[in-house]
């Protein structure tokens, strides 16, 4: 199969000074010229500047040794039951708190022993060590004492490190605790990130014990947000009632205060009347009954709705809700497969949908006009030029799409200006630089300008009206080169290359950058990732994925970047991971039903209501 998408494939001059005999040395004579009779040398520089890179580290090391031996120490810090010896000048240089203490008119400026209260002694020792060594380890066991101590001592760098550590620890079971911790210590950026995480993952957060233990004020802060990520307002009401019933005796007095932030007018009539209106706690509170009546009027009197607009009638607006990810074909258990499955980030579930009519590995996948196209590939025996098209409304594939002019596997596919482009790949004889595009109105493929380089296992992306061909292999070795197609000029031009050679990589456009992840270089599968800034024409690294992934799919779903499947050098993968640009971290977030190498991925909008759902091989409409 050619290159199938399978694993394995300075001195001074010599003149002498005459000062001893009464002579003189002038610039450019003895030292610079090497004496008389020889060829003249350029004059020596009159100044040599040197900056030692070792000096700061060596100096700190020696100062720390003095401290350890209690030499030249001029202050002792009494913290808890511990005495910490130090030098005022070092502490003052590192901490604004100590600088104010020792250089001002405070009593401590004249004391040799100073008592520091309201700070953990272990945290203080770690921070003093940092002042002398520039080294600290932040971990789960100490971050909750280090951060308040760093805030007190005004060690901003340590505050930032602690906040960064806590950002990386965020999950639905602890985000509320981290949020409260950030609020207590005025860590605004950490508070913002924790808020965003809570809003986005509210459906999981509401199941946590931390949620049930929230004070009423913090609960209100969360549920009043427009950015709360929920499938329906029913989830918010159910979350509030779970919180209330955790401690009914103490919390029922707050029901109306909380319920006014649930957007009751956005509930279905059935749920409003049958669940909310019939709840005994709601019915027993006059203010709650008024809120229910307000919602009923909103639903029953549509002509009056323009006059009834307010915070409770405003739909919540999480970023780009309603997208689902399809994983199409690929290589699994030694053979090409036809199976297709769909991932819903709202439920974190994978569901099987109708399979393709042909098995396809190395298939190119893209979405055009709300239809999912599967282009070319290899069925385990033959290279394919056939195309299939999937309609999510009927859960059916059709084969009435014109074939490409060449058989192609390991092909890059993307949509630009209403055309479907097929880029590179291999046809079983050679690696291709051919590019063609499909016009859905004419059901016809036509060739455009070829790339300057042959590329199989190429990744393609569309950004700012241009089509990018990224990496791949020329049939001999992996590439790091990148070229860009301008459809107005029908011309390819080179842009700056990636830092790493990659074939069978994943690629997607995210927040106006092109992300390139995984793939395979000359000798191994890759976990590394990088992104391209078209404004500066530069690539920069991001954190590596948790797994090596060649033949990986990459896609943006509901504003998040997902890496799907691939091959890690020893096994086909069914895991997926998601990238958070705020924390520059990848995290695993579930598994497909099938392991997939070289499968395609595509993103489509889900149906607008929940009356529709995909099942294994059928599409049903429910009357709810």
Curated annotation (Swiss-Prot):
Residues 15-28 have a biased composition (Low complexity). Residues 1-55 are annotated as: Disordered. Keywords: Actin-binding, Kelch repeat, Repeat, Ubl conjugation pathway. Kelch repeats lie at residues 324-370, 372-418, 419-465, 467-512, 514-559, 560-606. It comes from the Eukaryota. Residues 175-277 form the BACK domain. InterPro entries: BACK, BTB-kelch_protein, BTB/POZ_dom, Gal_Oxase/kelch_b-propeller, Kelch-typ_b-propeller, Kelch_1, SKP1/BTB/POZ_sf. Pathway: Protein modification; protein ubiquitination. PANTHER family: KELCH PROTEIN (PTHR24412), KELCH-LIKE PROTEIN 20 (PTHR24412:SF451). Probable substrate-specific adapter of an E3 ubiquitin-protein ligase complex which mediates the ubiquitination and subsequent proteasomal degradation of target proteins. May have a role in synapse differentiation and growth. This is Kelch-like protein diablo. It comes from Drosophila grimshawi (Hawaiian fruit fly). The gene is dbo.
């Amino acid at each position: 199969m050619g290159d199938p998408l399978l694993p394995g494939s300075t001195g001074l001059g010599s003149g002498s000074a005459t000062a001893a005999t009464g002579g003189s040395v002038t610039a450019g004579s003895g030292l610079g010229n090497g004496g008389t009779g020889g060829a003249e040398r350029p004059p020596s520089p009159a100044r040599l500047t040197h900056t030692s890179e070792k000096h700061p580290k060596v100096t700190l090391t020696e100062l720390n040794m003095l401290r350890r031996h209690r030499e030249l120490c001029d202050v002792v810090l009494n913290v808890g039951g511990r005495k910490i010896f130090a030098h005022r000048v070092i502490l003052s240089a590192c901490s604004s708190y100590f600088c104010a203490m020792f250089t001002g008119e405070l009593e401590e400026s004249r004391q040799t022993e100073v008592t520091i209260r309201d700070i953990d002694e272990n945290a203080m020792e770690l921070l003093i060590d940092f002042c002398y060594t520039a080294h600290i380890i932040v971990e789960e066991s100490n971050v909750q004492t280090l951060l308040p101590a760093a805030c007190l001592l005004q060690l901003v760098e340590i505050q930032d490190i602690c906040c960064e550590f806590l950002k990386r620890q965020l999950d639905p079971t602890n985000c509320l605790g981290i949020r409260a911790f950030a609020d207590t210590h005025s860590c605004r950026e950490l508070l913002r990130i924790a808020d965003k995480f809570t809003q986005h993952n509210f459906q999981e957060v509401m199941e946590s014990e931390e949620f049930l233990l929230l004070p009423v004020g913090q609960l209100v802060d969360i549920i009043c947000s427009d950015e709360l990520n929920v499938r329906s307002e029913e989830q918010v009401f159910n979350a509030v009632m779970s919180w209330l019933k955790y401690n009914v005796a103490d919390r029922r007095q707050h029901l109306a205060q909380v319920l006014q932030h649930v957007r009751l007018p956005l509930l279905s009539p059935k749920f409003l009347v049958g669940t909310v209106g019939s709840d005994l706690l709601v019915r027993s509170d006059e203010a709650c009954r008024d809120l229910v009546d307000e919602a009923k009027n909103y639903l029953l009197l549509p002509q009056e709705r323009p006059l009834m607009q307010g915070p409770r009638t405003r739909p919540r607006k999480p970023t780009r809700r309603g997208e689902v990810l399809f994983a199409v074909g690929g290589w699994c258990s030694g053979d090409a497969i036809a199976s297709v499955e769909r991932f819903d980030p709202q439920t974190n579930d994978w569901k099987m949908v109708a399979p393709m009519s042909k098995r396809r590995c190395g298939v190119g996948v893209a979405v055009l006009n709300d239809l999912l196209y599967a282009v070319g590939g290899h069925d385990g025996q033959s290279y394919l030029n056939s195309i299939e098209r999937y309609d999510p409304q009927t859960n059916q594939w059709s084969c009435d799409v014109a074939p490409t002019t060449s058989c192609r596997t390991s092909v890059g596919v993307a949509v630009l200006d209403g055309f479907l482009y097929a880029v590179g790949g291999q046809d079983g004889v050679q690696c291709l630089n051919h590019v063609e595009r499909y016009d859905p109105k004419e059901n016809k493929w036509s060739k455009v300008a070829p790339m300057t380089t042959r590329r199989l296992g190429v990744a393609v992306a569309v950004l700012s009206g241009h089509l990018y061909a990224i990496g791949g292999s020329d049939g001999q070795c992996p590439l790091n080169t990148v070229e860009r197609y301008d459809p107005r000029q029908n011309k390819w031009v080179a842009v700056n290359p990636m830092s790493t050679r990659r074939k069978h990589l994943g690629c997607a456009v995210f927040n106006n950058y092109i992300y390139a992840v995984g793939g395979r270089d000359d000798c191994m599968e890759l976990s590394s990732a990088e992104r391209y800034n078209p404004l500066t024409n530069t690539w920069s690294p991001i954190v590596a994925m948790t797994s090596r992934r060649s033949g990986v799919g990459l896609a943006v779903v509901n504003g998040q970047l997902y890496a799907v499947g691939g091959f890690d050098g020893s096994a086909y993968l069914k895991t997926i991971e998601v990238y958070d640009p705020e924390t520059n971290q990848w995290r695993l977030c579930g598994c497909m039903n099938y392991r997939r190498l070289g499968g395609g991925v595509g993103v489509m909008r889900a149906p607008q209501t929940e009356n529709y759902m995909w099942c294994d091989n059928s599409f049903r409409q429910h009357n709810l």
